[in-house]
C-alpha cells in the first residue's frame, strides 16, 4: 500500500511576484544535488490523524520555527502521486513577508543507514535549508511529482475555484 504524506506549500508575494517556499532534503544522498532535491514541507500521516493536521505538524517540525497563523482557510491543492508511488496531499498557506529567517530554521532529525547497506547509522536533518523560489524555478528543482502543486497554486490564486 502506498505511503501517504501531507504537507504545506507556503507562498508570498513580494513586489507583486509570487514565490513559494521549498525545503532542500537533508542527508548525504542529497548534499550535492539541486534538481529534484527540493520538496514542500511534508511528512507521513499518522494512522488516526487528519491529513491537514499532519501537514501543519510536519511543517512545524521540519522548520523548527513558528508557522504563520492561518488567517483564511488553507487552500486545498489536492493530491499528487510521486514516482515512488507515494501520495502527497497538500495545502497552501500564505506566509507574510519576509517569511522565515533561513538561519533560524532548525529541522528535526531522522536516523538513516549510511552508506547504504553498511550497517552504520547516522542522524541527519530531514531538511538542511529552505529558500523562496519563483514558480518557474520551483518547478525546475522540486521533486518531479510535486511540480503540479505549484501549477495548482498559481491557478487557484488567479481563480480560487480552480485549485483542485
Regions found by a protein language model. Give the residues of each.
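Alpha-helix-centered segments that form part of catalytic cores
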Residues: 120-136
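Residues that scaffold the ATP/ADP-binding catalytic core of kinase and kinase-like folds
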Residues: 32, 48, 141
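Charged phosphate-binding loop/patch that engages nucleotide di/tri-phosphates or the phosphate backbone
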Residues: 131, 135-164
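Active-site-adjacent beta-strand/loop module that shapes the phosphate/pyrophosphate-binding cleft
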Residues: 79-119, 131, 153
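Short, charged/polar surface micro-motifs in flexible loops or helix N-caps
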Residues: 15-17, 27-30, 46-47, 84-85, ...
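The catalytic Nudix box helix
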Residues: 40-75, 134
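N-terminal strand-loop-strand
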Residues: 1-40, 91
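Functional cleft and adjacent loop/helix regions within the main domain
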Residues: 36-41, 47, 83, 92-93, ...
Amino acid at each position: 500500500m502506498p505511503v501517504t504524506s501531507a504537507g504545506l506549500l507556503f507562498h508570498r508575494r513580494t513586489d507583486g511576484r509570487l514565490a513559494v517556499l521549498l525545503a532542500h532534503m537533508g542527508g548525504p544522498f542529497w548534499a550535492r544535488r539541486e534538481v529534484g532535491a527540493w520538496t514542500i514541507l511534508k511528512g507521513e500521516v499518522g494512522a488516526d490523524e487528519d491529513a491537514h493536521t499532519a501537514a501543519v505538524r510536519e511543517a512545524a517540525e521540519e522548520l523548527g520555527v513558528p508557522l504563520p497563523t492561518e488567517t483564511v482557510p488553507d487552500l486545498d491543492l489536492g493530491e499528487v502521486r510521486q514516482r515512488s508511488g507515494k501520495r502527497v496531499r497538500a495545502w497552501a498557506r500564505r506566509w507574510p513577508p519576509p517569511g522565515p529567517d533561513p538561519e533560524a530554521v532548525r529541522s528535526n532529525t531522522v536516523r538513516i543507514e549510511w552508506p547504504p547497506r553498511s550497517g552504520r547509522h547516522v542522524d541527519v536533518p530531514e531538511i538542511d535549508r529552505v529558500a523562496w523560489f519563483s514558480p518557474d524555478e520551483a518547478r525546475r528543482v522540486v521533486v518531479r511529482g510535486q511540480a503540479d502543486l505549484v501549477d495548482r497554486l498559481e491557478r487557484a490564486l488567479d481563480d480560487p475555484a480552480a485549485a483542485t
